[in-house]
Amino acid sequence: MNEFDRVRDYLTDLQDRICAAVEAIDGKARFAEDLWQRAEGGGGRTRILRDGAVFEQAGIGFSDVSGARLPPSASAHRPELAGATWRACGVSLVFHPHNPHIPTTHANVRYFRAERDGEMVAAWFGGGFDLTPFYPVDEDVMHWHRTAQALCAPFGEERYAAHKRWCDEYFFLRHRNETRGVGGLFFDDLGQDFERDFAYQRAVGDGFLDAYLPIVERRKDTPYGEAERAFQLYRRGRYVEFNLVYDRGTLFGLQSGGRAESILMSLPPQVRWEYGFQPQPGSAEARLADYLIPRDWLG
């Protein structure tokens, strides 16, 4: 089996396993599957869970797409690849819980290959996972980062620190001067050693559930009221702003003629903006700002 097919098979299995785990913890709703084809090449399967007991919306998509020419978002930092043919596969997810005390989360693992005249000119892995709480709890954030550190450990002492820092820098809203959440891991252009890099991608993909599900279990029955729900919807606005203004995956998908429904499944089903909103000093809502600055979470 060639390298691309090995990655593809892993990713489809990962999607299946994550869906099964989410359905089990939700206990009410199930994922609906939408199979799609892309005229320019390839296709995918988008799965959406709606109106569950735990999740307002959980979306997880697998795609295997190709094209005759790289879009600008992919070749901007690799000008030598401009005009190359390409093929990419990946799994991307965003989960929006009902309860404001459960963080929103995002994860992505992907593989990209570019060719010219039938010869591979570049191939690399990318991905990571990050956490966006509205009412953060130190225990949860520390668990998230300790899980990330543990899965990075076999790949060198500097791996966690480097990819945590990359995550903090990538998921940053410059126009708001704040991070999107409390970070996690982010990596791109990892293409020096296929076997080692593929092993790391698998560690990140497999580690996501270990990082997230214990937090869901701890917070899913926490009581909340209208004020907490309103703040959750307001903060979801930051999620929308990041995805539509900065996110490379969103821009790549839209610029490459990707399927808009699948690309934009990351957006929350409900969201609100409020001009000039300021939380009450000393409130739980005001406390969030202290978490939107990169810091060491390992304790």
Curated annotation (Swiss-Prot):
The active site is at H106. Pfam families: Coprogen_oxidas. It catalyses: coproporphyrinogen III + O2 + 2 H(+) = protoporphyrinogen IX + 2 CO2 + 2 H2O. A divalent metal cation binds at H96, H106, H145, H175. Its EC number is 1.3.3.3. Residues 239-274 are annotated as: Important for dimerization. Substrate binds at S92, N108, V109, R110, G257, G258, R259. Keywords: Cytoplasm, Heme biosynthesis, Metal-binding, Oxidoreductase, Porphyrin biosynthesis. GO terms for cellular component: cytoplasm. Involved in the heme biosynthesis. Catalyzes the aerobic oxidative decarboxylation of propionate groups of rings A and B of coproporphyrinogen-III to yield the vinyl groups in protoporphyrinogen-IX. PANTHER family: COPROPORPHYRINOGEN III OXIDASE, MITOCHONDRIAL, OXYGEN-DEPENDENT COPROPORPHYRINOGEN-III OXIDASE, MITOCHONDRIAL. NCBIfam families: PRK05330.1 (NF003727). This is Oxygen-dependent coproporphyrinogen-III oxidase. The gene is hemF.
